[in-house]
Design a protein with these regions (language model features):
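Ligand-binding clefts/hinges and TM-proximal coupling segments of bilobed small-molecule sensing domains
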Residues: 144-162, 201-202, 233-266
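Extended ligand-binding regions for polar small-molecule ligands
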Residues: 55-64, 126, 130-131, 135-136, ...
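A ligand-binding cleft/hinge motif common to bilobed small-molecule-binding domains
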Residues: 78-81, 93-103, 150-151, 173-207
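Periplasmic-binding protein-like
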Residues: 35-36, 112-120, 186, 190-230, ...
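Sec/Tat signal peptide C-region and signal peptidase I cleavage site
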Residues: 20-29
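Bilobed "Venus flytrap"/periplasmic-binding protein-like clamshell domains
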Residues: 31-32, 36-39, 50-63, 96, ...
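Extracytoplasmic small-molecule ligand-binding "clamshell" domains
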Residues: 28-94, 103, 225
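Short helix-initiation/N-cap motifs at beta->coil->alpha
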Residues: 55, 70-81, 124, 161-173, ...
Length: 266
């Protein structure tokens, strides 16, 4: 796993591209927006270094393109306007490809398959969605978890849907009892709760999602990045990231391994 590092501005061109902090005065070739704190995709480790599956992936993409990469922290819901306005060149944060999003942005091919899930306090006695009647459910603003809860809240009779800007503040409220459950991407939640016995993922919510890098609509950079991702899949680099961050081998039939076409709106 790679931490974000800062190379000197005098570094020779023979070296690989630098991945730099957003606070650096050195201008990067590519500015990448990310909701830092989104484990295990992009977050700060105990040493304060920004690390994660997607950090490693985009750092390698930058190197293959011969471009330096700067990661800037953007709330998830702000990533869409940031990429459309040109403030950032691309966005990551386990962003799900949807037909609705494809109307206004472009995605490279997917590299991870996912579903949603429900996490609760282990002491709550809640065993799944059926136990959330009249309860407060937390979601990330603008996320597919937000969309799912909004579309299905009536069926499960949620008492309230409370929106957060990222996993960390939602987890704080869950532990404190201010929300009763939290709906979000299952890989992030399984990673987060693995060393927190007070929390428990109690139900997988099948949504058939795929994650990718997001660009402004029609940006030629998307095709360049897509080609590099194809190469990295063929070399086994993306599959190796899966083993590094999830401790398990990616199945051959998943988008982590299979080279796929860039998605287009239906």
């Amino acid at each position: 796993m790679k931490a974000i590092t800062l190379l000197s501005s005098t570094t020779t061109s023979a070296l690989l591209a630098a991945v730099i902090f957003s606070t650096s005065a050195i201008a990067a070739d590519l500015t990448v927006g990310a909701n830092i704190g989104n484990v295990p995709w992009e977050f700060q480790n105990a040493s304060g270094e920004t690390v994660g599956f997607e950090v490693d992936l985009i750092a390698e993409v930058g190197k293959r393109l011969g471009k330096s990469v700067e990661f800037v922290n953007v709330p998830f819901n702000g990533l869409f306007s940031a990429v459309q306005s040109g403030r950032i060149n691309m966005a990551i944060s386990s962003i799900t490809i949807t037909d609705k999003r494809l109307e206004s942005v472009t995605f490279a091919q997917p590299y991870y398959d996912s579903d949603q899930s429900l996490t609760v306090s282990a002491a709550s006695g809640i065993a799944g969605l059926s136990g959330m009647e009249g309860k407060v459910v937390g979601v990330d603003t603008g996320s597919t978890g937000d969309m799912w809860a909004t579309n299905n809240g009536g069926q499960y009779k949620f008492g309230e849907i409370r929106k957060f800007e990222g996993l960390s503040p939602a987890m704080l409220d869950l532990v404190a009892g201010r929300v009763d459950g939290y709906i979000s991407d299952i890989p992030a939640l399984l990673y987060y709760v693995k060393d927190k016995p007070e929390l428990k993922v109690v139900e997988r919510i099948p949504t058939g999602e795929k994650y990718s890098v997001m660009f402004n609509k029609g940006d030629p950079l998307a095709k360049e990045v897509n080609e590099v991702i194809s190469t990295l899949k063929k070399e086994g680099f993306v599959a190796k990231l899966h083993e590094t961050w999830f401790g398990a081998k990616a199945e051959d039939t998943t988008s982590t391994v299979m080279v796929m076409d860039m998605p287009v709106a239906k």
